[in-house]
Amino acid sequence: MSEKPLLSKDEKRLLKIKNRMSRKRVEFRRQEWFRYKKFNESWRKPRGKHSKLREHLGYRPPVVDAGYRSPAAVRGLHPSGFAEKLVYNVNDLKSINPDREGARIASSVGMRKRKEIEEEADNLGIHVFNRVVK
């Protein structure tokens, strides 16, 4: 089983930047999420005419912006650097490139089939993200 993906120097550098950005990224919350019970914390763009949050006033929390996005070359990759592929059965493992991709076993897969998938992944040298703890 390959522990690390084959990445170029540039991809490794961008992955480090992405992981650092992810740690620093603030939690974007909806305007006045604390005020009303019916408001979830999940982000909603402020659209009010006099909204201080929409106007990006400094004493307000940060607003979602393109500058918080991770580098395009490594966007969507697992923090380890592997691209995730969802696997439902043993046949799905055949389409995975073990040098660049890892497998995530679907939540709907039962324990018996999960063990079969993990054994076959070990034989093929494929990294499984959500292994059953032994």
Curated annotation (Swiss-Prot):
Q: Name one GO biological process term.
A: translation
Keyword field: Ribonucleoprotein, Ribosomal protein
Quick one: signal sequence residues? none
Q: Which domain of life is it from?
A: Archaea
Q: Which InterPro entries match?
A: Ribosomal_eL32, Ribosomal_eL32_arc, Ribosomal_eL32_CS, Ribosomal_eL32_sf
Q: Which GO terms describe its molecular function?
A: structural constituent of ribosome
Gene Ontology, cellular component aspect? cytosolic large ribosomal subunit
Keyword Ribosomal protein carried by entry: yes
The similarity comment for this entry is: Belongs to the eukaryotic ribosomal protein eL32 family.
Q: What name does the UniProt record give this protein?
A: Large ribosomal subunit protein eL32
SUPFAM superfamilies (alphabetical): Ribosomal protein L32e
UniProt key word Ubl conjugation: no
Q: Which Pfam families match?
A: Ribosomal_L32e
- Fetch the PANTHER family from UniProt: 60S RIBOSOMAL PROTEIN L32 AND DNA-DIRECTED RNA POLYMERASE II, SUBUNIT N, RIBOSOMAL PROTEIN L32
